[in-house]
Structure formats: C-alpha cells, structure tokens
Curated annotation (Swiss-Prot):
Catalyzes the post-translational formation of 4-hydroxyproline in -Xaa-Pro-Gly- sequences in proline-rich peptide sequences of plant glycoproteins and other proteins. Hydroxyprolines are important constituent of many plant cell wall glycoproteins such as extensins, hydroxyproline-rich glycoproteins, lectins and arabinogalactan proteins. Residues 248-288 form the ShKT domain. GO terms for cellular component: endoplasmic reticulum membrane. The gene is P4H6. It comes from Arabidopsis thaliana. It is found in: Endoplasmic reticulum membrane. GO terms for molecular function: iron ion binding; L-ascorbic acid binding; procollagen-proline 4-dioxygenase activity. It catalyses: L-prolyl-[collagen] + 2-oxoglutarate + O2 = trans-4-hydroxy-L-prolyl-[collagen] + succinate + CO2. Residues 116-238 form the Fe2OG dioxygenase domain. Its EC number is 1.14.11.2. It is a single-pass type II membrane protein. This is Probable prolyl 4-hydroxylase 6. Residues 1-4 are cytoplasmic. 2-oxoglutarate binds at K229.
Length: 288
C-alpha cells in the first residue's frame, strides 16, 4: 500500500476510535460475509433480534407517510415520485432504549461514530412497491453542510418477504457471476442482489477509500411480488450529522501536528477535502 494512503487510513481510524460510543456490543465475525469489493458491501446475518425488528415496526405503524425523493440539488427540497413508491417515517435518535442500542450496535459494527448517523428511517413496501436504482451520496449544498457525503448505508431487514423486495446493485462488478434460481425476482437478476431476511443487515459504502463517490454503489429496492417488506435504514455521514460546518475548525486534536509534518500536501483529501466534501483539518492547513 502506498505510504500516503496508509497514513490517511491510519488518521481516519484514530478519529473514528476516538469518537465511537462506549456501548458494549460484541461483533460476531462468523455472521459477517463480504459480498463485494465493487461496491464494498457486507452482510451481517442476525444483526437484529426478532424483538428489535418487531419493536421498530411497532414504533412506525400509524405514522407512515409517502416516501419522497430529493428534487432540487440546491435547496435539498423533496417531492413525490414514482421512482420511490414506499411509505416511511423517521424515528428520533435514541428514541428509547431499544433504538439507542440499535444505534450503538451500528457504530460498533461499522466503526463509524453514532453522531455521524441520521435518525433511523423505517420503510414499508407493499405489493408492487419499490425504489428504483439510485445513489445515496448527493451534491445538494444543504445536505453537504449537515455532515458531508453519506459515506455508508446500512439496510436492516425487519421482516421476511415471500418474493421480491431484494436489494439490487446494477453496477456491481465481480469476477464470479451470482447464480440465481426462480426464487429471485426479474429485477434482482439485473445485478448483484440480496434477499431481505428478518434480522439481517446490509452495509455498503457510497464512497471510495480516497473519499470520492463510488458509482458502483448504485442500488435499488426491487418490487415486492408477494408479502410485504419492512426495513430500517441508517445513513452515515463523513462527519457529525446536523451540525453545519460554517466555521473554520479542525475535527481532530492532532491536526496541527499532522499539518506541521506536511500532511496537508501529502493527504489533501483527508486533511483539506474537496469542493463537495470538507476535510478534517482545514484550519491547520489554512484552507479556510
């Protein structure tokens, strides 16, 4: 590995470990499968218990509204669209003990701080409902100010689906084709796909390791053919979500030391950032 990329990765880990929740959760590596490198995707079988799944669904019932999509990249305003036909709602962060534990488990598994995550979104798909392929990263200025790009997405399946409802990655690139029998929907055969199974969680990254957006992360929710689908989504940003970065600050106590060592020039993506994603040491690098 090139030394500058190794150092950037090490700096990232330092930042992450300094912010992760103290909640104790043992990640079971025997339940985790790496599905793909393009995009980087992982499946954690049995991440949520049946009780956790049922509780999240119960919190959402009676509060669901038609799902929306972003319509204006400048304002971030949303609109109704046939691209996305599910219904959903957002919980509040740490709404109760179970929600707080789920959020802490997500931080422990992903090694990404709790504060970087949006509130959990609960989604319900009935017969024929779907979400066409889309990206979870974005370029609207309002969203970027609230935490930068969504570095990762975690989809947690809260119910089993008789048929359909798979998560599909149309731009997936792999050496070995994924074999699919008649139990898979036609939509799922358009790329690499994951069947929704109650309790399982799918983690995939929307950005490359160097911080640039990954077009291979294009994904969609296939139409439900039989049954219904419940899921919970956790979008995780590159920095604390909801705090506008309008002041010139460093996001790590070692920024000045790294800047003095020349890291502003050696690792500009991490230290300074780009037009669409702010770096972590802009003040020390005199970028603002």
């Amino acid at each position: 590995m090139d030394s500058q990329y190794f150092l950037a990765f090490s700096l990232s880990l330092l930042l992450i470990f300094s912010q992760i929740s103290s909640f104790s959760f043992s990640v079971d590596p025997t339940r985790i499968t790496q599905l793909s490198w393009t995009p980087r995707a992982f499946l954690y079988k049995g991440f949520l218990s049946d009780e956790e799944c049922d509780h999240l669904i119960k919190l959402a019932k009676g509060k669901l509204e038609k799902s929306m999509v972003v319509a204006d990249v400048d304002s971030g305003e949303s609109e109704d669209s046939e691209v996305r036909t599910s219904s959903g709602m957002f919980l509040t962060k740490r709404q109760d003990d179970i929600v707080a534990n789920v959020e802490a488990k997500l931080a422990a598994w992903t090694f990404l701080p709790e504060e970087n995550g949006e509130a959990l979104q609960i989604l319900h798909y009935e017969n024929g409902q779907k979400y066409d392929p889309h990206f979870d990263y974005f370029y609207d200025k309002k969203a970027l100010e609230l935490g930068g790009h969504r570095i990762a997405t975690v989809l947690m399946y809260l119910s089993n689906v008789t048929k359909g409802g798979e998560t599909v990655f149309p731009n997936w690139k792999g050496k070995t084709p994924q074999l699919k029998d008649d139990s898979w929907s036609k939509c799922a055969k358009q790329g690499y796909a994951v069947k929704p199974r109650k309790g399982d969680a799918l983690l995939f990254f929307n950005l490359h390791l160097n911080g640039t957006t990954d077009p291979n992360s294009l994904h969609g929710s296939c139409p439900v053919i039989e049954g219904e689908k419940w899921s919970a989504t956790r979008w995780i940003h590159v920095r604390s979500f909801g705090k506008k970065k309008l002041v010139c600050v460093d996001d790590h106590e070692s920024c000045q030391e790294w800047a003095d060592a020349g890291e502003c020039e050696k690792n500009p993506m991490y230290m300074v950032g780009s037009e669409t994603s702010l770096g972590f040491c802009r003040k020390s690098c005199k970028a603002c």
